[in-house]
Amino acid sequence: MRLRHFAILTTTCLTLWAPTGCSAPPSDSAPAEAQAEIPAPTAGDHEVLPSERLAERLLTANDLGPGYAARPAATTASPEASVEGCPQLEHLGNAADNPYAMFPNQGKRVFTGPGGTQLTEELYSAPPKDLSAGVGRIMTTMGACPSYRLVTPTTVAEVRTQTVPVPRLGDEQWGQVLTVTAGGRRTIVQQTVIRAGAVLLVVSGSPAEVTVHAQTALAKATAR
């Protein structure tokens, strides 16, 4: 199966192995514990937001604090990857090879953080019913295989997936952790997905950073 950045998490993992990517955490890293449950605002009127308004609601480096900087938008395509051992992921090769592309209203920003870490925030907007059904299918498919191999022209990585609990923010929440092992290094990447009304937030990065910044991102994304 040949896919190009077939899933947001896999794109993040590929970036982590690039020379300009983030340094891997220590080998004994583990998913951070979920923070205390704190209510967050939801989009009560379920208004679908255009991409321009979503872009205004993305986090900035100032929102994240010292040591963070926004990365320039990518000018080249992600490396093509083959997935071995998980035929279910083939379904995520549709919609421009991005499973979230079914939601045309979207915004994205990538940050580098202290120590060379990477944090990615994405916002999407669609009717709540469409967001709920679409993301449910995506996360079910991405979690269908507990392990598989990710092969690029320069890297062969063993990937293990784990569904994890996330704070009860917004209307619906999903969480997944990927443990990627290649070249003697192990990298752990978490993706937290939160739907609040007609807005969908996707935050990917190290478990600790995702746990710390997801609530701030949701508050800004759903602010009136």
Language-model-detected regions and their locations in the chain:
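N-terminal export and membrane-targeting signals
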Residues: 1-13
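Solvent-exposed, polar/charged alpha-helical surfaces in well-ordered, non-transmembrane soluble domains
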Residues: 52, 56, 62, 133-136, ...
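N-terminal "mature-domain start" segment
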Residues: 23-105
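Sec-exported extracytoplasmic/periplasmic mature domains
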Residues: 59, 69, 129, 140-143, ...
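A small/polar (G/S/T-enriched), proline-flanked helix-loop surface module common
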Residues: 68-180
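A short, solvent-exposed beta-edge/loop patch
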Residues: 157-220
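C-terminal motif of bacterial Sec signal peptides marking the signal peptidase cleavage site
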Residues: 17-21
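Second-shell loop/turn segments in exported
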Residues: 48-50, 119-126, 203-205
